[in-house]
Amino acid sequence: MARVKRYCGSYILEIIGDKIQEYCGRYLYQISNGRVQEYCGPYLYEMKNDRIQRYCGSYLLEFDGKRIKRYCGNYIAEVEGNRIKQYCGPYLYEIEGFLSNEQMMALIAILFA
């Protein structure tokens, strides 16, 4: 039985057995026991018993002021409060820590030097 552990593009992030665990696209995010647990599209992020628990739009999903734990969207360029102000690129799924615009540009300059 094939096992895809993590693929952070438009498609599957993790499959265990026949069960989709994570999907970082525009639609379903997690299926457990035949139920959609989390939905990472432009509107709701997680539902429990018909209640919206988290919203995956331009807001951060987990942010403690310095660390971004999880964001199912684009590369983050600037955070103001708990809102993502600027972002670019299609792929980032999870990071630890946060780079400012200046730090990010410096990193890009180093990578392409």
What are these regions (language model features)?
Residues 1-26, 33-34, 42-43, 49-113:
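Long terminal segments
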